[in-house]
Amino acid sequence: WTDYILQVLIIAWEDYMHTGDVSSLNYFYNDLKEKTLHKLARKDGLISTKTGLVTKEILNAVHLSEIEYSRQKKENPTFRDLVDWPQKNLNANKESWQYGIKGETDDFDFRNINTVINSYHYQSLVIMSKISKILGYLDDYYFFKNRASKVKNSINKKLIKPKSGLYIDGEGSIHSSLHANFLPLKFGIIPKKNLEKVIAFIKKKGMSCSPYGAQHLFDALYKSEQSEYGLKLLTSKGDRSWAHWIYDLGATMTLEAWDFKFKPNMDWNHAWGSAPGNIIANHIMGIQPIKPGFEIVRIKPQIFDIKSAKLNYSTIRGEISMSIINDYKNFFSMDINIPSNMEAEIYFPKYFNDQKIKMNGKTIDHVEKENFLIVKKIGSGQKNFNIFR
């Protein structure tokens, strides 16, 4: 799938941020460049897998599996755009598992220039520019940096409905799917003037995606600080929820689809159903590295009205342990232990005007930013924080 090839850059970057080790980036550097698929671009930078640009050289450069040759039953197989799974198949016969199912793409209108694919492409270019700079390939750095800017401009010029401010599924389409809007939100593509419109649209759509798509949906929601809606969706008990798996289907393992009615032949052990594991750690408790190898960690809890929460989080520098007591809009307290050789940047929810923060009983300076108060350069060791007015 085209999507998976582009996601390799995201995986490589996450590995670097969590370990601080450049050896993998260095070893696979040329492979990573090819997996941006920048050679499939037209003049405006947007890429397509359907316009005859996918050559054998490109397939070989990204190491297309031999399995795909037999799977596609073609002499010259090509990439296929996923968006989400399963897809609707109007040509499926009655014996096929795809017969009669709606699919999980939110009626995505597949076009040559695909908004989902080009959103991934944009992010792959951004990451490749960072990797090039880290490794000292400055010509590549400027190429990928400039190409990313071009692609972002083209997406916003050619793939937005002017009146609604929403993204269409692809060039020539009039349909706006959930997927075509949550990926631009996740990757920071959306113009500021359209942000509220896109977020409102996403909230109206609910869980109109598979467990695979849910990962990206939650990333987008928490990146845009939509913690109330994010928690509502995460704890839903409808037929598109993790609670449905546990309480209704009796699952003890993450599944491929929300229910058999959405994919009759779903398997019972699919890793892509495990989004809550990282969403809770990285977004609700808010632990993310902002300097490679956790030299600096951001702690940005977005727990909304959860009363209490605890987490132990292993990093390459040691374990971060934290616990929170929360009375939404009234009280917030955090105990945290930061490992040696790590510095923290901690975000606290803004519950009051003229709010202040105490660390170990002493008032400390902070920076206010929209819905948060931020304290930087917190060193290692056990700390207690309270907000007050």
What kind of feature is each model-predicted range?
Residues 4-10, 20, 24, 117-120, ...:
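Structural signature of alpha-solenoid helical repeat junctions
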Residues 4-9, 15, 47, 63-73, ...:
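C-terminal capping/lid segments that line or modulate ligand- or cofactor-binding pockets
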Residues 6-9, 13-16, 26-40, 122, ...:
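Hydrophobic core segments within long, regular secondary-structure runs in both alpha-
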Residues 18-117, 135-181, 293-294:
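Active-site acid/base region of carbohydrate-active enzymes
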Residues 145-146, 153, 231-389:
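Non-catalytic C-terminal accessory modules of carbohydrate-active enzymes
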